[in-house]
Amino acid sequence: MAPKFFGIEHILYLIISSGVASAALLLAKKYCKTDRQIKVFFKCFAALSLVVVVASRFAQALCFGGPRWYMLIPDSYCAMTSLVLALAVLLGKKNNPVLHFVWLLGLFGGVSTAIYATFLGQNPSFFFPPTILGLLHHSLTATLVVALLLFKQIDVTYKKWHYTLFGFTCYLTLGAFMMQVFPISDAFHIAEPLIPGTALTSWVMAPMYAVGYALVLLLVELIKKRNARKCGNQK
């Protein structure tokens, strides 16, 4: 019998992965004090995340009826965001522009997909490589974003909102290219909805995400102003 959504395997995975992620972040916060230690922590974390997402792409390419090498290229928002985030942290500097595009996608996509894992039933085994690696790369991506925020490696601000527009444009352009060149009917939910039976294609989700992102940025600015007033009053 295939693993079920919120079945025993899924619930155990969520409990264990949440516990491990929390412990890792607490230990890192306790022991990583210098800039060098923080840098090493993030490079190692990003390298691990990169290995898992690349392994996930190989699993997608090899485990469904033979080699489909074009599947090495991520064709979904979550997979591409996991790859881009890992590379941005591994190769980029603190607060680099790419992070401002992927941080919210990585956090929301990682958490929501790990919880609402609709792909669990694709094989009788919970440890079927595409299943377990898919769960792991979503979890690692979400945890990496939390770590970036926790260690102040990204300064979330409305002043860099345009990187999100540029990033979405790149995703959709790549998706359209893949649909034309490779034997696939959809990429990045351009043609097919995220949830079957709904209207949640990219053309609907992009405006929804833009509104949600704007609200998050507004909330961040309000928090910053409140903290600044508190600091001013204390002085």
Spans of features found by a protein language model:
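N-terminal topogenic module of multi-pass integral membrane proteins
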Residues: 1-44, 49-55
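Membrane-interface transmembrane-helix boundary segments in multi-pass integral membrane proteins
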Residues: 2-16, 159-170, 178-218
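Hydrophobic cores of alpha-helical transmembrane segments in multi-pass inner/ER membrane proteins
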Residues: 14-25, 78-90, 137-151, 205-221
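Membrane-interface helix-boundary motifs at transmembrane edges
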Residues: 30-42, 90-99, 151-162, 226
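Hydrophobic residues within the alpha-helical transmembrane core of Major Facilitator Superfamily
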Residues: 54-55, 83, 111
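Juxtamembrane "helix-exit" motif on the non-cytosolic side of transmembrane helices
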Residues: 55-65, 115-125, 181
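Non-cytosolic membrane-interface motifs at loop->transmembrane helix junctions
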Residues: 65-77, 124-134
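Membrane-proximal helix-loop-helix units in multi-pass membrane proteins
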Residues: 87-151
